[in-house]
């Protein structure tokens, strides 16, 4: 199908995403989106702890299974190892068909390419990809579509329910045992955690690390 700038969009892409082709800069002016309702978990017993010892235990407690969507942020840029650590454990557990919904992926995440090749990761939704991940996508190694959005477009997709995040991993520099997070006060201060705000609000489960006293 031909879009508003004359580009032919494959029908299989339209069918897979349920999207319309680009109809012009102002085609959605005054359009109303309905927000999805996030899942909220209650904690009434002050003696019950949400703490776990490691990534494996966190994944088990979050109910990891085939076909889930896992989200990450990129505030640590090329110093981020959260994606690699989590995906290594998911791979070791034998989980397949994972979609990664990240605010961005860079060269620091090159180690996850083998998981694309073996089917651990089958979909990527991000605001950008670089390095060997980009090469893997460009050469057809990713089974499903790679969907790129602006940072604001990613927020809209999550808030509207177009993307449902099952588990969000947020590598905040500091957090407490209640899950309150901030971007300073630790060993990897990174500034405002704005990219991960929508993940924290809408994901079914949220995992954080770098504990400090409440």
Residue ranges of model-derived segments:
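Conserved alpha/beta enzyme-core scaffold
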Residues: 1-214
């Amino acid at each position: 199908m031909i879009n508003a700038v004359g580009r032919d969009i494959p029908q299989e892409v339209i069918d897979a995403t349920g999207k319309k082709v680009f109809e012009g800069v102002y085609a959605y002016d005054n359009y109303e989106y309905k927000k999805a309702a996030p899942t909220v978990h209650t904690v009434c017993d002050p003696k019950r702890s949400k703490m776990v010892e490691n990534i494996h235990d966190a994944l088990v407690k979050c109910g990891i299974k085939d076909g889930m969507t896992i989200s990450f942020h990129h505030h640590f840029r090329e110093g981020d190892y959260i994606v690699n650590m989590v995906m290594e454990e998911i791979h070791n557990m034998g989980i397949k068909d994972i979609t990664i919904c990240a605010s961005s992926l860079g060269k620091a995440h090159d180690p996850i390419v083998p998981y694309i090749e073996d089917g651990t990761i089958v979909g990527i939704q991000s605001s950008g990809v670089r390095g060997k991940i980009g090469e893997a996508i460009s050469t057809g190694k990713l089974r499903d579509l790679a969907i790129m959005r602006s940072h604001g477009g990613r927020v809209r997709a999550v808030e509207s329910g177009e993307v449902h995040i099952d588990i969000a991993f947020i590598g905040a520099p500091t957090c407490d045992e209640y899950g309150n997070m901030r971007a300073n006060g630790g060993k990897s201060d990174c500034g405002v955690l704005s990219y991960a705000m929508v993940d924290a609000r809408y994901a079914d489960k949220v995992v954080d690390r770098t504990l400090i006293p409440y």
